[in-house]
Design a protein with these regions (language model features):
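Core segments of cupin and vicinal oxygen chelate
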Residues: 2, 9-52
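Vicinal oxygen chelate
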Residues: 3, 5-13, 31-35, 60-122
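Short, well-ordered turn and helix-capping elements at secondary-structure junctions
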Residues: 57-61, 78, 96-98, 102
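Short secondary-structure boundary/capping segments
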Residues: 45-49, 61-64, 98
Length: 122
């Protein structure tokens, strides 16, 4: 098994706003898929080499964004500051600036939906 985690969902209150936010900060298209009923998902751009962990923005009556609980670390690329600099102009908030960690660098932000998220790069 290559990865312990292979998929994640980011809940949204306003699906279109969340898709625009992640498209803006990650610099790639969010691909929207209708799931039927009140459910939609927006596939995040996958920047990993040769596949790997992926995720999507979810929209359903059960979607409940949160700044508590599990925190997802997105790939910050070669310099996560490039992505972090786009967070506030896109409507999010930087909670912890780029910080040296044992495995490289990390930063924490909240998205437009109120989800606490992080960036990491080695």
């Amino acid at each position: 098994m290559a990865n312990s985690i292979n998929w994640f969902e980011i809940p949204s209150k306003n699906f279109d706003r969340a898709c625009k936010f992640y498209s803006s900060i990650l610099g790639g298209e969010v691909h929207v898929a209708e799931m039927g009923g009140d459910m939609k998902m927006g596939m995040l751009p996958n920047f990993s080499q040769g596949g790997g962990v992926g995720g999507h923005i979810s929209s359903s009556p059960d979607s409940k964004p949160s700044n508590e609980g599990v925190m997802v670390y997105l790939n910050g690329g070669d310099d996560l500051q490039v992505i972090l600099d786009k967070v506030e102009p896109a409507g999010g908030k930087v909670v912890m600036p780029k910080t040296k960690s044992p495995g490289g660098y990390m930063a924490i932000f909240t998205d437009t939906e109120g989800n606490r998220m992080a960036l990491h790069n080695a």
